[in-house]
């Protein structure tokens, strides 16, 4: 039997519900002073009457206007970022490896406090920060700055129920659905993170639809809108089956510079999934099917999002996949016969001259860099191999699948539900056009960033270092 409520409904809350249906842009958050304490801030829904008046008026309502982004607790977040602490980092030499020589750090503790402590030694020195903060879905938001709370305390904090178990306002989800706490948590940390970046440093932040808008606004304020470099879309095969309408298969990666004017240009990176495409191409070539059949298979393969950027590399030989390009050049006067290797007849030429001298062309033919047709009626083309053209500017849409990383983590019995793929982090780190700098990750989780940095160094001989920061969470008893 349900517990009886010996009081009338909260008509104000019901009226706010009704207004929210008609004018959702008029609903905001405000501090609930009645149910708040110095230790616990409780928020409630409220109506922005200035906006409501405007919604009900055909004319512009008098009053000062200002473009601003604010929330309950914003000023407190700024104060928190600037507040000094009386703590220090304590070395754990017995748990460390190569303590006297390592240049890498793994720090356990609240990342807000750690960021403050790092100001002394790393102020203005870091070239790159990568973070994968909680996406504010409720269960993953553990970074409230008094962060250990029971569900009952959490419900009380956001005003879901009062001490008599009466619902204070309509909100059937967790505190993560209210953006104020998340914005406060991120804002203070972004302020401190910016201090640590060098003038030519950059920060990358993974996020999804829940907070991409608020994160972009926070970063615009902390770093300046002019310093936002890009918002990457990260596409994946892994659908998140948590939506009633659309199967979400993408996330975002926000990239911001400390100062875009001094950030090094020429962000040439290795094309994503190039190793995989080269491997598949070689397997097709070695399968015994004809060259034309291999070409047809690759034409079909590049229609998949994972291989979109290789849509021209649909031929393959003993060197790997290549694209066929024009051998002529506008205004060229280099005209001579190029003989077909089978028919021994001069190949067809266009209205323009060859792009190479006769000596250079002979060398290209000898080195098997020329693609001939079935006979001399087809113009020869130049082979441009993928392995020689693997680096290019990063594209704003990237394809990475986190399923393989999740499976690897589970196989290793690590208790992290949504780890980022190592190749994905390697790609991010490789964007920066140097290989001797320190990467900070203050939401390090399973330390995928550290893994990626070490693996990338092993591949290209770089000397990148890392600083990982993670809350000292309890491990699952079944993990090793």
Model-found features: residue ranges?
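Secondary-structure transition/capping motifs at alpha-helix termini
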Residues: 122-126, 194-201, 221-231, 431-437, ...
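Conserved Class I SAM-dependent methyltransferase catalytic core
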Residues: 162, 169-232, 467
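Conserved S-adenosyl-L-methionine
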Residues: 111, 145-155, 183, 210-212, ...
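Flexible, glycine-/basic-rich loop-and-beta segments that form/coincide
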Residues: 240-311
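Segments forming glycine/polar-rich beta-alpha architectures that bind adenosine-containing cofactors
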Residues: 117, 121-122, 130, 273, ...
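Short, solvent-exposed loop/turn and secondary-structure capping segments
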Residues: 118, 138-148, 216-217, 243, ...
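Short, surface-exposed recognition loops and adjoining beta-strand edges that mediate ligand/DNA contacts
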Residues: 47, 227-245
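DnaQ-like (DEDDh/DEDDy) 3′-5′ exonuclease domain used for proofreading
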Residues: 1-130, 135-188
């Amino acid at each position: 039997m349900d517990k009886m409520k010996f009081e009338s409904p909260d008509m104000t809350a019901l009226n706010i519900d009704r207004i929210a249906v008609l004018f959702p842009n008029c609903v905001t958050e405000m501090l609930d002073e009645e149910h708040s304490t110095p230790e616990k801030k409780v928020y409630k829904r409220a109506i922005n009457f200035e906006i409501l008046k405007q919604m009900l008026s055909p004319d512009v309502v008098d009053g000062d206007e200002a473009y601003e982004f604010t929330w309950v607790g914003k000023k407190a977040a700024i104060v928190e970022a600037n507040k000094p602490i009386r703590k220090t980092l304590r070395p754990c030499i017995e748990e460390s490896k190569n303590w006297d020589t390592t240049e890498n750090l793994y720090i356990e503790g609240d990342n807000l406090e750690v960021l403050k402590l790092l100001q002394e030694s790393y102020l203005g020195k870091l070239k790159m920060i990568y973070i994968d903060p909680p996406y504010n879905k409720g269960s993953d938001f553990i970074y409230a700055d008094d962060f250990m709370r029971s569900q009952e305390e959490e419900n009380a904090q956001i005003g879901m129920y009062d001490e008599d178990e009466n619902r204070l306002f309509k909100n059937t989800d967790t505190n993560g659905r209210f953006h104020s706490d998340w914005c406060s948590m991120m804002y203070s940390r972004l302020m401190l993170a910016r201090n640590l970046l060098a003038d030519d440093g950059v920060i990358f932040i993974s996020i999804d639809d829940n907070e991409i808008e608020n994160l972009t606004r926070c970063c615009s304020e902390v770093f300046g809108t002019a310093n936002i470099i890009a918002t990457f879309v990260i596409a994946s095969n892994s659908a998140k089956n948590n939506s009633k309408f659309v199967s979400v298969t993408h996330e975002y990666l926000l990239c911001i510079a400390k100062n875009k004017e001094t950030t090094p240009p020429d962000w040439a990176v290795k094309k994503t999934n190039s190793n995989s495409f080269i491997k598949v191409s070689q397997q097709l070539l070695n399968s015994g099917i004809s060259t034309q059949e291999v070409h047809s298979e690759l034409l079909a393969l590049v229609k998949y999002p994972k291989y979109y950027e290789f849509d021209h590399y649909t031929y393959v030989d003993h060197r790997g996949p290549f694209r066929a390009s024009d051998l002529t050049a506008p205004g060229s006067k280099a005209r001579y016969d190029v003989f077909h290797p089978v028919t021994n007849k001069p190949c067809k030429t266009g209205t323009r001259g060859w792009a190479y001298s006769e000596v250079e062309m002979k060398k290209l033919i000898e080195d098997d860099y020329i693609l001939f047709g079935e006979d001399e009626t087809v113009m020869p083309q130049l082979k441009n191999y993928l392995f020689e053209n693997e680096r290019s500017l990063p594209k704003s849409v990237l394809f990475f699948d986190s399923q393989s990383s999740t499976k690897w983590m589970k196989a290793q019995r690590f208790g992290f539900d949504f780890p980022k793929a190592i190749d994905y982090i390697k790609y991010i780190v490789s964007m920066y056009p140097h290989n001797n700098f320190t990467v900070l990750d203050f939401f390090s989780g399973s330390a995928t960033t550290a893994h990626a940095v070490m693996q990338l160094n092993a591949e290209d001989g770089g000397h990148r270092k890392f600083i990982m920061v993670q809350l000292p969470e309890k491990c699952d008893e079944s993990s090793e």
